[in-house]
From Swiss-Prot:
One of its GO terms (biological process) is L-cysteine catabolic process to pyruvate. It holds the Pfam family SDH_alpha. GO terms for molecular function: L-cysteine desulfhydrase activity. This is UPF0597 protein VFMJ11_0655. InterPro entries: Ser_deHydtase-like_asu (IPR005130), UPF0597 (IPR021144). It comes from Aliivibrio fischeri (strain MJ11).
Length: 425
């Protein structure tokens, strides 16, 4: 395997991984669990300091196994019973007794959450104290990327700044990667080298089934399924894509105790990169090898596009994740590379106005809408229809991706600020 392809696999294995619950509150849970481990006993008080963007994405989403919403319960539960060795699955084995103990800490005013001014989009600092010691853990740049630990005010760990950071914000820096090179890698790599990506199907389809079997959030997936059964809507590939993607997001945002295979720090975006591709593969009876190659396009393509702008911005990442999914769907349908590029262009043209106003139950609607856009855009591309140069869409897909990055990075910070202020008011 050439060295560039090895880098691609390292990227995928670094940011396409299982995550239990929305990754922003889980970030606080993880930091709190590490702080408790440093203390050697359960804390008596917990102070949580987070960036505006992490605050935004934690306000309205349920924390798995708790039945509750927000950063306070996430941090308290992580401190009381979290497993610091489990990363994004830190709360996988939390018990009802531990949740009740965490809630008691909150009820007694022992857990305080504050916003902290920082240039980092992903930032969380937790200070946990007991009668004897104080432990402080700082995460910055990635949901589990610890950059500093302090015990009783003394630094006991700091991330070596000379080492490459496994940050979601810099994952593609210095890597020779384009849509064309992703396509070549996906279609030419040895199957044995990429088949690990198939776990995405197992996890995210299980999450979708959970969302169909049980009531979570807005029940977007269940509602569409019920109306098909009533005859109000027709069953089709398009409806299957909408139902399963929405149901998976319903379950995830509603606190289901099943992990999602995340993409670039987001479970919803992992769903958006996975389920439409699975449904397209099922329709064409694609084998595991074909599906794995399609997953490489959707997951690595999404990572590449999103590397052009900061994580947790005012832009909904599902909008461009679905563009990469559309690329993969064209491939599964027997389309050409040029048609796959057209699918990306079409999707971005359709979804580029979608904002992020925090992680919550309505994400299921955005995930479903993005998935439907991927399907629509793939069909247009397969029939040789591509949007012309207009708006943020350029003649070349690479320039379009750069335009999206510019729009978000330069044009949307004020929008993000206003969204956060509205939510906090």
């Amino acid at each position: 395997m050439n060295s560039i392809w090895k880098q691609y696999i390292d990227i995928l294995q670094g940011v396409v991984k299982p995550a239990l619950g929305c990754t922003e509150p889980i970030c606080a849970a993880y930091a709190a669990s590490v702080a408790t481990q440093m203390l050697g006993s359960k804390p008596e008080t917990i102070d949580v300091f987070v960036s505006d963007n992490l605050y935004k994405n934690s306000m309205g989403v349920f924390v798995p196994r708790t039945g509750r919403v927000g950063l306070a319960i996430a941090a308290a539960t992580g401190a009381i019973g979290g497993n610091p060795d489990a990363g994004l699955e830190v709360l996988a084995k939390i018990t009802e007794e531990e949740v009740n103990e965490a809630q008691s800490l909150i009820d007694n005013g022992c857990v305080v959450v504050q916003r902290e001014t920082t240039d980092e989009f992903i930032y969380c600092r937790v200070i946990a104290k007991n009668a004897l010691h104080s432990a402080e853990v700082t995460i910055s740049g990635g949901h589990t990327l610890i950059i500093e630990k302090r015990l009783d005010g003394n630094i006991i760990f700091t991330l070596d700044s000379s080492l490459p950071k496994t940050s979601t914000a810099s994952i593609c820096d210095g890597v020779d990667i384009t849509i064309s090179s992703i396509y070549d890698f996906a279609t030419q790599a040895e199957f044995d080298d990429i088949k690990f990506i198939l776990e995405a199907k197992e996890l995210n389809i299980a999450l979708a089934q959970e969302g169909l079997n049980n009531p979570y959030g807005l029940e977007v997936g269940r509602t569409y399924q019920k109306n098909i059964e009533k005859g109000l809507l027709a069953k089709s590939l398009d409806s299957d894509i909408l139902i399963y993607t929405s149901a998976a997001s319903d379950a995830r945002m509603g606190g289901a105790t099943l992990p999602a295979m995340s993409n670039y720090g987001s479970g919803n975006q992992g769903i958006a990169a996975t389920i439409p591709v699975v449904k397209m593969a099922d329709f064409f009876n694609a084998d595991d090898e074909k599906l794995a190659r399609a997953f490489i396009m959707s997951h690595l393509g999404a990572i590449y596009i999103k590397s052009h702008y900061p994580p947790l911005s005012a832009f909904c990442g599902n909008a461009v994740t679905s563009a990469a999914a559309s690329m993969a769907m064209v491939y599964l349908a027997g389309g050409t590379f040029e048609q796959s590029c057209s699918a990306i262009q079409n999707t971005i043209s359709d979804t580029s106005g979608m904002i992020c106003d925090g992680a919550k139950s309505t994400c299921a609607m955005k995930v479903g809408s993005s998935a439907q856009s991927a399907m629509k855009s793939a069909l247009l591309a397969l029939n040789d229809h591509c949007v012309t140069k207009q708006g943020v869409i350029a003649d070349d897909v690479e320039k379009t991706i750069k335009n999206i990055g510019r729009m978000i990075t330069t044009g949307m910070p004020n929008i993000d600020h206003e969204i956060i202020e509205i939510m906090a008011s």
